[in-house]
């Protein structure tokens, strides 16, 4: 890590004035880098982390999950269907353009056309420009999650992204896993500008001199994001001083990090559910509820949480973690090998069958090891698994094609709400609305769809919770998916890199506010 006194600091010291701010140059090692620079191409942790660095949302969560004003200074409800947002004035994009309501409306419309994000904004009718610095978000019906959804509106530079590129293609086009102007060009309002990017090698960021948030104490002027897939290699880079911060820290490495001089380990409980989906379209056996139940009973997820995750995870029996509106304390993990064998026999598969499985090897903590363990467990009920693991850059295109019989996916609820988990993972797939966008199990239950639709217009918290709990019970009984665990979070950093105030349960550290002291 390099520390350098800013020109302002030098000038102040030359004038005999005290100034303790230092400009930091740090390197952060993650398990993988963002797959694209288009903030709407993929709904993933890597994309959202990039968004919080290069863009700003209208509002964001603080560490207590309270809403914090960002590009919207304030907001108020106009009527049951309308929330009004008052925008900050004088906010500049990296291009030099000034942010206005036009950019917010343009971004909202683009989100509604994004295959990955449209489901979040399906309850909305439109965004309306009231004046240059006022925008109304209008929902189709009463909707209780407007502010939660607004955390996903990162205003884009509409002038920068409008028109044609050198190949005659629309600059605003969203191309999944392909080449587009937005996937390689970026202009936001955030604390950092992307100055260089080599996919799979590094992304270089430089602090935006005209950043609007002058109250931020962040003093990182240069940041390099470096992907290091292997857990042990990532830790070694931190301990040797090659990098200044790493994420995640695998459970096996916690003691190494905690025991190192000048290094801190910061942990938080997590709400990201890790699951396997069972593709009913690719393997006829998985259409039988008894087979799906047998698979759930055969996978010892409590053992995975204890041994592979070293206790740094909570075994799950449902989608919703404790504290979410749909969480049902009665839906517990249910490993029972004998029960699994009985169900296989009852379904006519006593001798088992074969299936394919895919999983990433650098997206979730110990993802490949978990997949290998699950495959071994399924062999005990006669299911022969052909497992393939791959880096996430190759994994997501395969997942989007639902290219296996069982597929690993983790999900952190975008709105910190139970309904979001179902909307993306277990509702009936609908390309028009975006519902079920990541439902490669092709599970479809009209009652689940109906309950979620009703929950999205229910403003009574108790009634809404009852609807969401009923959804979890149906998914549990149908064995709609294989719940594994809720993944906890861990970061490691040099002690003078103060990450505790910027990390959060969403797993999007607010690097713009990061303070680094001189050693």
Model-derived features: where do they sit?
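Ligand-site clamp/hinge motif
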Residues: 210-256, 384
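Short, solvent-exposed loop/beta-turn-alpha elements that line the ligand-binding surface or hinge
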Residues: 46-77, 153-189, 211-219, 256-268, ...
């Amino acid at each position: 890590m390099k520390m350098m006194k800013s020109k302002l600091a030098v000038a102040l010291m030359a004038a005999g004035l005290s100034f303790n701010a230092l400009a930091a140059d740090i390197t952060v090692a993650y398990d993988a880098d963002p797959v694209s620079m288009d903030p709407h191409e993929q709904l993933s942790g890597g994309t959202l982390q990039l968004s919080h660095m290069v863009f700003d949302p209208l509002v964001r969560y603080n560490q207590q999950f309270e809403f914090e004003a960002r590009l919207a200074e304030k907001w108020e409800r106009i009527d049951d269907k309308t929330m009004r947002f008052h925008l900050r004035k004088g906010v500049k994009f990296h291009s030099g353009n000034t942010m206005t309501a036009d950019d917010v409306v343009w971004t909202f419309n683009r989100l509604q056309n994004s295959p990955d994000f449209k489901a979040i904004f399906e309850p909305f009718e439109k965004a309306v420009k009231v004046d240059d610095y006022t925008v109304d978000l209008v929902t189709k019906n009463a909707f209780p999650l407007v502010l939660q959804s607004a955390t996903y509106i990162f205003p884009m530079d509409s002038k920068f992204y409008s028109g044609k590129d050198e190949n005659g293609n629309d600059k605003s086009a969203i191309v999944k896993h392909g080449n587009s102007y937005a996937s390689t060009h970026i202009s936001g309002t955030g604390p950092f500008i992307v100055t260089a990017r080599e996919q799979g090698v590094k992304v270089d960021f430089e602090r935006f001199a005209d950043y609007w948030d002058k109250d931020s104490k962040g003093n990182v002027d240069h940041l390099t994001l470096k992907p290091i897939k292997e857990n042990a290699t990532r830790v070694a880079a931190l301990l040797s001083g090659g990098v200044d911060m790493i994420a995640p820290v695998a459970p096996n490495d916690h003691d190494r990090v905690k025991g190192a001089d000048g290094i801190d380990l910061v942990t938080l409980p997590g709400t990201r559910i890790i699951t396997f989906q069972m593709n009913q379209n690719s393997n006829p056996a998985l259409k039988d509820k008894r087979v799906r139940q047998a698979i759930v009973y055969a996978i010892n997820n409590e053992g995975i949480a204890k041994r592979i995750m070293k206790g740094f995870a909570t075994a799950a029996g449902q989608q919703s973690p404790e504290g979410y509106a749909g969480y049902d304390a009665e839906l517990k993990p249910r490993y029972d090998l004998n029960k699994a064998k009985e169900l296989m026999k009852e379904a006519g598969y006593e001798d088992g069958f074969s299936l394919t499985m895919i999983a990433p090897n650098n997206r979730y903590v110990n993802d490949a090891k978990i997949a290998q363990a699950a495959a071994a467990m399924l062999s005990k009920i006669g299911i022969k698994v052909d497992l393939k693991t791959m880096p996430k850059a190759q994994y997501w295109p395969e997942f989007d094609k639902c290219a296996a019989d069982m597929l690993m996916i983790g999900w952190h609820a975008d709105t910190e709400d139970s309904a979001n988990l179902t909307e993306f993972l277990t509702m009936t797939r609908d390309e028009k609305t975006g519902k079920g966008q990541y439902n490669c199990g092709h599970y479809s239950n009209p009652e689940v769809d109906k309950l979620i639709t009703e929950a999205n217009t229910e403003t009574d918290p108790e009634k809404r919770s009852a609807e969401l709990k009923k959804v979890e019970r149906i998914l549990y009984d149908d064995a709609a998916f294989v719940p594994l665990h809720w993944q906890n979070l861990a970061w490691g950093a040099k002690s003078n890199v103060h990450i505790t105030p910027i990390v959060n349960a969403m797993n999007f550290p607010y690097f713009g506010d990061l303070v680094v002291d001189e050693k």
